[in-house]
Amino acid sequence: MTTPLDAFGPGVIIVTRTDIANSTPVNIGYAQEFSPEFSGNIKELFGQNQFPIDAARGTVKVTGKIKAAVLSGLAWNTAFFGSSFVTGGIKWNPLEAASVPAVSTYTVTVINAATFDADLGVVYALTNLPFVKVASAPAAGQYSVSGVGVYTFAAADASAAVLINYTSTVTTGQTLTIANSLLGSSPSFQLDYYTSRSNKAFVARYYQCQSAKISFAAKLEDFIMPEFEVHMFANSAGNLGKLYFPEVS
């Protein structure tokens, strides 16, 4: 028995920037959902009776929701930010254990002091109570920190076990710089969608798209699923896109 064309699952989504030359196509990564919607305005003409005697469709708004399962900087930049990357980034160093020296100068140099970036706070290891940061001359329960990762504590906290949180820089990975761009500045991209079942592929291509929103919620006992709100519009040839059906049905 031949099954009719149907589809199951979210399919594959590729985005390719159209506002710059020689753009690299990017898979948004483990697509979880793609929900395009065509929504038109219908204007109805009434006479003296209850039901309209004519109707005409006005403007049509085409939007889509994309949900992915990969934190892809390339996809985010292509579909929303349109910015640039620099090599390297920031490493978190959470709860690095240390002991305040028993004698002066009561200083602790963190492990990654050579690439120290920013202080994120200090707590007592035994009670998890936080220290208070001060500019200099700390008293009991206080600390100061230099720009090279040296933490200074009070004599009253000598021999105390502490947990230090800080960031340092790394040369791996990449960092996306989010600039405060002029109004009207946003990347446009082509969206290609593919899904297949029973060796029958359904394909959609939207020539010009822009993202109005990107969000990613971090929840207890759940994965982060980045979401994009996409708006589709016509290209210079006056075409919005095309849908391919593998059979006449």
Per-segment meaning from a language model:
Residues 69-70, 111-114, 127, 152-159:
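Secondary-structure transition/turn motif
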Residues 65-69, 165, 192-194, 229-231:
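Residue-level recognition of well-ordered beta-strand positions that form the cores
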Residues 1-79, 129-132, 137-142, 201-202, ...:
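Solvent-exposed edge beta-strands and adjacent loop segments
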